[in-house]
Amino acid sequence: MAPQTSNLWLLLVVMMVMSQGCCQHWSYGLSPGGKRDLDSLSDTLGDIIERFPHADSPCSVLGCAEEPPFPKMYRMKGFIGSGTDRDNGHRTYKK
């Protein structure tokens, strides 16, 4: 029974690979063989830019302030760490 099951799985895998390998996928603006028309590509990029005029900077899209969030996290980590060190009796001395 084991050889029949393994043969069935092998047949299914081969059929799946063959079905994906024999298909031709078409996309908007693509010619057969994967050759692209460069004029339509620039038009497509222009359309994308026109649809998102507010996306000039990452902060305008994400709504963040001028300062990235990473320094804030490190300052918060240092603040929390210094508080827990004091609670445990540790002191930090600056030179």
UniProtKB/Swiss-Prot annotation:
**One of the record's GO molecular function terms:** gonadotropin-releasing hormone receptor binding
Task: Answer yes or no on keyword Heme.
Answer: no
Cellular component terms per the entry's GO annotation:
extracellular space
Q: Where in the cell is it found?
A: Secreted
Give a yes or no for keyword Lipoprotein in this entry: no
Region forming the signal peptide: 1-23
Residues with the modification Pyrrolidone carboxylic acid, per the entry, are 24
- Enumerate the UniProt keywords alphabetically: Amidation, Cleavage on pair of basic residues, Hormone, Pyrrolidone carboxylic acid, Secreted, Signal
Where are residues bearing Glycine amide located in the sequence? 33
What PROSITE patterns does the annotation carry?
GNRH (PS00473)
Give the UniProt family note.
Belongs to the GnRH family.
Reported function? Stimulates the secretion of gonadotropins.
- Recorded protein name is Progonadoliberin-1
Species, as recorded: Pagrus major
Taxonomic placement: Eukaryota, Metazoa, Chordata, Craniata, Vertebrata
